[in-house]
């Protein structure tokens, strides 16, 4: 199972069902991702030495050449609080600051479904769904 940090507001938007598309570059662990795989997302930004986490299941994966093309199709499900493709691209580029990464890798629209409730545990706990 893949375990990945997810920052706010994306963590809460996925949990409440507003965000059903996760956007990632087609590299590393995400290059090998396939439908039915499980990802545990965690967030420890609230402090208090606590980690919030939940699991999602991958439903499907689409590849795109650019963030613009991906957002033309999926902006409302990938970035539900964002109304323009231009602003959405700016947000996504903050996470992928290396210019060569943006051109080297395809962009993935990962259709996801939450399969577990949020749990709050001490940061040192093991992962499990």
Feature annotation, model-predicted:
Residues 31-45:
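Short coil-to-beta transition motif at edge beta-strands of beta-rich domains
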Residues 3, 38, 49:
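Short histidine
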Residues 49-63:
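Short beta-strand-centered aromatic/proline hotspots
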Residues 1-35:
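Compositionally biased, charged N-terminal/linker segments
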Residues 35, 54, 108:
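Residues that flank catalytic or metal-binding motifs in active/ligand-binding sites
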Residues 30, 46-48, 63-67:
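Short, charged/polar surface micro-motifs in flexible loops or helix N-caps
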Residues 69-129:
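Contiguous surface segments at macromolecular interaction interfaces
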């Amino acid at each position: 199972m893949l375990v990945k940090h997810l920052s706010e507001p994306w963590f809460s938007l996925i949990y409440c069902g507003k965000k059903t598309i996760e956007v990632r570059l087609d590299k590393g662990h995400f290059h090998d991702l396939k439908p039915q795989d499980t990802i545990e997302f965690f967030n420890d930004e609230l402090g208090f030495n606590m980690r919030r986490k939940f699991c999602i299941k991958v439903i499907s994966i689409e590849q795109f050449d650019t963030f613009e093309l991906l957002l033309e199709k999926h902006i409302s499900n990938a970035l539900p609080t964002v109304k323009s493709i231009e602003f959405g691209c700016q947000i996504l580029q903050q996470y992928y600051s290396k210019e060569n990464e943006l051109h080297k890798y395809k962009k993935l629209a990962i259709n996801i479904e939450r399969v577990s409730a949020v749990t709050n545990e001490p940061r040192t706990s093991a992962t499990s769904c």
